[in-house]
Design a protein with these regions (language model features):
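Surface-exposed cleft-lining segments at the edges of enzyme active sites
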Residues: 85, 99-100, 130-144
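Short, basic/glycine-rich phosphate-binding loops at helix/coil junctions
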Residues: 74-77, 124-136
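Short, catalytically relevant binding-site loops at active-site mouths
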Residues: 69-70, 116-117, 131-133
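A contiguous catalytic/ligand-binding core that recognizes phosphate-bearing ligands
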Residues: 84, 88-124
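Active-site and ligand/interface coordination hotspots across diverse enzymes
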Residues: 1-91, 114
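Soluble or luminal CAZymes and related metallo-dependent hydrolases
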Residues: 20, 92, 144-148
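Conserved small/polar residues in nucleotide/adenosyl-binding loops
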Residues: 149-156
Length: 160
């Protein structure tokens, strides 16, 4: 996570730089470094903040909050509910697609379950817990990142 502080985040830098210097965030960072060293954690470190990388703050039209990343290999990609193509859409995403169809009469315009196109169109797909241990739902729900993502989601919705 050392690279997290120095990289660019598509316009989110002012919010990130302020939080990255706080003690609670330093604790989260240290915890995640240990977790990644000792366990299988999803998503891969380099895409933990993928939701912010793909959706600039000025482009956010809607925020969709998920609980935590998918717990199985090859699924978590740093976007709530999204899975990389050609992974089949999980049941939670199929429910979202079904709701879209019922409400709009149209099918979702994504290939498989990869919601990257939505993120690039202004849908902030943010999990309240950004990481998870393989096979263990809610395993990182108490490390403080939930407060961080709630803060980001709240600040974002104030500007919609």
């Amino acid at each position: 996570m050392n690279a997290a502080v120095s990289r660019s985040y598509n316009g989110w830098e002012p919010l990130f730089s302020e939080e990255f210097s706080k003690d609670y965030f330093k604790g989260i960072k240290a915890f995640l470094e240990r977790e990644y060293a000792q366990k299988t954690v999803y998503p891969p470190k380099k895409i933990i903040l993928n939701a912010f990388d793909l959706t600039a703050p000025q482009d956010v039209k809607v925020v969709i909050l998920g609980q935590d990343p998918y717990i199985n290999p090859g699924q978590a990609m740093g976007l709530a509910f999204s899975v990389p193509y050609p992974v089949p859409p999980p049941p939670s995403l199929l429910n979202i697609f079904r709701e879209i169809k019922e409400e709009t009469g149209r099918d979702s315009a994504v290939k498989g379950g990869d919601l990257t196109v939505w993120a690039k169109q202004g849908v902030l797909l943010l999990n309240t817990s950004l990481t998870v241990v393989r096979g263990v739902s809610n395993s990182h729900s108490n490390i403080g990142a939930v407060s961080y993502t709630h803060l980001r989601a709240h600040e974002t919705t104030l500007h919609l």
